[in-house]
Structures are given as C-alpha cells and as structure tokens.
Amino acid sequence: MPGLPKNEHEALEFLKSNNIKWVDLQFTDLLGKLQHITIPSNEFDESSFKVGFGKLDGSSIKGFTSIYESDMVLLPIPQTMTLIPWMQGVARVLTKVFWGGGKGRFERDPRGIAEEAEKYQSEQGYVSYFGPELEFFVFDKVEVDASLPQSGTGYKIHSREAPWSKNGGYVIRYKEGYYPASPVDQLMDIRLEIISTLVDYFGFTIEAAHHEVATAGQGEIDFRFSTLADTADKVQVLKYVTKNIASKRGMIATFMPKPFFGDNGSGMHTHFSLWTKDGKNLMYDPNDEYAELSQIGRYIIGGLLEHGRALSAIVAPTTNSYRRLVPGYEAPVYLVWSKSNRSAAIRIPAYYKGMEKAKRLEYRPPDPSSNPYLVFSAILMAGLDGIRRKLDPGDPVDENIYHMSEEKKRSLKIRELPGSLDEALNELESDNEFLKPVFNSSILQAYLDLKKEEAKMMQLYPHPMEIYQYLDS
C-alpha cells in the first residue's frame, strides 16, 4: 500500500504515481462535522500548499461566516494526503481554513485551535499525548419519521443481533456484548475491514478492536496515542472510514452517544498524559503508593475537576449526550477521580506497575459526537490551568458512587456533571477564562450561539415517550 507523504514534494509525487484524477479537500466545521469539496488533481502544483484553493463559501457552513465575507481558502496539509480506497482514482487531503484576500487564518477553524493549543503548551515546555477510545454502533437500517413533525415523529432501528431482531439468528442480550466471539458477534468482519483500511491506507497503528457492551452492533476501535492535532485528525478519519465502509455494505454507522434506551451508550474515553520535551512523563511518580501519580498529575486532575462542568459543553455537546451520562450504564456522572472506579469522571489506569511510559489519566465524559480538535484542546487547557493554580483534586473515591447516599456525597463535596446541554452551556458561559489563551472569543461565542440554538430547537418537539406518558392526561 502507498506510504503517506512527508512533505509537499512527496504529496505531488503521490498524486502522479497513484494516477489520481480527483482530490477531496476535507475540513472540519465548528460542530465537528467533516466537510469536503472535490477538485481535479491537475490543479495541484508546488504553490498549492502555500497558496491553497479559493473554493469555500464560508456562509454555507454553520458557525463560519456571513454572506458578505464568504470567500475562504482551503490550504492542504501534505502529510494527510491518502487514497480513498473505495473510490477509483480519488485521493483526499485534510486542509486548514483561511480567510480570503490574504487576511490570515480563520479564527473559527477548529484545527487552528488545536494548533494554537500545541503552540501554547510548547511555550510552557510541555508535550501532550492523547489516546481516545471511540465507540459506535453499526445498524442494518434506521427508519426516521421526522419530515412532518406536526403529525408525530419516531424512529426504528434494525439490527441483526439485537434482542428485537426477527432474523432468526443469534442475538446479544442487553449489556452482554462484551466480548462474545463470532458467530454471536456478527460484526467482526466489518470491524476488521475498518481497521485494515485504517492501517493500510491511513497510517494508523491499531491497538484493539472489539464488540462493546451494548447490543445492536456496538463496537470500539482504539488506535495508538499521538500528539493533539494528529490525534484529532485521526478521530475524524476513523469516523469517516467507519461510516463509508458501513454504507458500502448497505448498513449505517453512527457515533451518536445514545441511539436507544436500555443499554450502554457510546463514549470517547480520552487518555491524556503530559511530558517534558526531553521525554519525562510529568504524571509519573514511582514513590506514590496509591497510583504512582505525581503531584503535577494531581494538579492536572484538579483542573479537569474544577472545570468539568464547563468542559461538558464541549466534550458532551449534544442533547443526546445527556441520555448517556446517567447512572447504571458505565457512564461517568460524578466529578471525582479514582484508580479504577468507572463511575468516576477521571480514572487512573492501573494495568501496569513501575512503567513510566504508561502513566496517564482517562477522562471519561467525552463522547464521539464532539469536535475532537476542541475536546483535546479544552482538556489540555483545563489540565494546564490546574498546574498553574496548583488545584488540589481532593482524595480519590474508590467506591461505587451510584450506590452512595446523598448525605455521604454531600459530605465528600461530590459534584455532578450537568444533566442537560442547556446546563452545560450555562457553565461554559460562566467558566471559560481557562480556555482563552487558546480559544479566541470569536469561536467561543459562535460555539455557544450554535449550541444554544440547537438546544432550543430540540426543546420545541414533543417526544414519543411524552405521548406514551401523558396521552391520557
């Protein structure tokens, strides 16, 4: 399989040697959706990676620009040039978004925020690494009736392995998807195709792929950790490849957090570590008896707990996110930390002892409906604020908080994550100073405005369960 280009020259050679006819220019919008424009490959030359392509109408992208300042430029990132293996003679490349007219980088380009975060941490003498675990569902079909909301809305999920399936084959019972072998696991072949494509064409190193806890085709793919912007790029690629391979098979992949009631939702647990530039893990202390965690590591946790409610608006950014973040489904609800407690927002993995390179934290609230460029940048900034202010995270909580009395939770001063998107947005609106060295006011305000509009719109529609519950009122 073709190797990934390392520079502009190799990217141009890549187009020639692979007989590429079309190139997909891809970028991420403010809400985390991957967008694209396709151009002829013969438009690429030596200047393309310096001048870019004036192809984007920014007024057509939510949260970008208005119609009177809509001309924008997409600047290709040569190291991201790859084949699209399910299309003949087509390549794709990720791009940076610039204002037209030579006015510089577009301040609401999410990838630009990730680059600013990397620059900011470098100025502080740090390097960070991120390793997200992406969960998702692959359904056979989803029927949605929302075109005439006045007469009612609804949806139906078809899944060959779900308890409600009528296919006559094996089913996976609720919460028993972790880890039955095939043929009970009926989606191993599609996961293998996804991870093989990621490795062969997109430069991934895969660490694991497996069925997840939920029925109806829930899976997880874990790839090797990397630096902030590169990891966010890989999240977008993984979602893109997964959706396309499912679609090619006549199925549908979704990264929404909670597509149906009664089973676990999909998260994006994010592993994070902070290092010096000369390769020392700042979170590791072999003399710490509890978790081999350093004082700096505790300060990072303190920052994440301090700003956890505000972070929710970025890491759990949809109304559906808060149907996942409820007790009973292995999702975090409480802003505490622990060595192995999966009801806590922050977990310190304890697979190994005495291994500096493996010391990290796992931040559990994020889900894959989020914008990874903003998520990883916000996690970094909260952690750095914890270091700067020496925020004490308090003692770890190792018992199941779901079973803890309200009185005990109050005595331990345990705070909960927001219970809704509205609540999370209010928290972000009042607590965002820690983000401002990297998140400019333009992107913060645009994000808040878009998400408030989204939350308000969702509140207008009666829910099918409301009909069930209140029809006899």
Swiss-Prot record:
Residues the entry annotates as binding ATP: E207, H271, F272, S273, R342, R347, K357
UniProt-annotated binding residues for Mg(2+) 2: E135, E212, E220
Disulfide bonds: none
Cofactor binding remark: Binds 2 Mg(2+) or Mn(2+) ions per subunit.
E.C. no: 6.3.1.2
Pfam families named among the record's database cross-references: Gln-synt_C, Gln-synt_N
Misc: GlnA of S.acidocaldarius is unique among the archeal glutamine synthetase since the regulatory properties suggest a position within the GS I-alpha subgroup. However, the sequence shows more pronounced similarities to the GS I-beta subgroup.
UniProt subunit comment: Oligomer of 12 subunits arranged in the form of two hexagons.
Name recorded for this polypeptide: Glutamine synthetase
Species: Sulfolobus acidocaldarius (strain ATCC 33909 / DSM 639 / JCM 8929 / NBRC 15157 / NCIMB 11770)
